[in-house]
Amino acid sequence: RSTELPKVHSSALPSRNLRRDADAIRQKWEIVVIDGGARVTEHAYAAVGAANWLIIPVRPSKVDLDATAQFLDIVQADMAKRDDLSGGLLLNQFQEGTSISNVAKKQILEWDFPVFSNMLHSYVAFSEAIWQGQSVVEYQPKSKAAVDICKFFEELKEATQW
């Protein structure tokens, strides 16, 4: 890993420990990313409870849109009780020019929740990078996929003021 890239640490915590340990983890790391999963589960509830910023990826499919709508109900209920929780929806695996992607984009823009202007397209480089144990920026730094990630990260830094 290049010394120019930030150090990344990965760990897995059971749902019951996530809320309790979140503050201690935040003290140790500048940025903490919690993958809460794609379904409304105990772990997803715990991840929302431990978070102060949510990135909610949404794939352009009926099943994913329905699941995201259910998840947003949980998120918005939590946001109503707290003033330290923010977030945004990120279109993921978007395919330009397809009717399903266009319908999905239109639908999420109608929801009462912020949507990132940048999106992640459906590029093979994302999957290949994972197979290599790398980020797409490491794997193919000049690829369209890497450009997508970099644009999204710049927007995220601005939104979160990191």
Task: Locate each region found by the language model.
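P-loop/Walker-type NTP enzyme "switch/lid" segment
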Residues: 1-38, 42, 81, 106, ...
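Structural beta-sheet core signal
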Residues: 34, 56, 89-91
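Inter-motif core of Ras-like GTPase G domains
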Residues: 39-62
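Short histidine/acidic/glycine/proline-rich micro-motifs that form metal-
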Residues: 61-62, 92-96
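Conserved C-terminal guanine-recognition region of P-loop GTPase G domains, centered on the G4
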Residues: 68-81
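Beta-strand-loop-alpha "switch" segments that mediate conformational coupling across diverse proteins
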Residues: 95, 106-134, 149
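NTP-binding/hydrolysis catalytic cores, primarily Walker-type P-loop NTPases
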Residues: 133-162
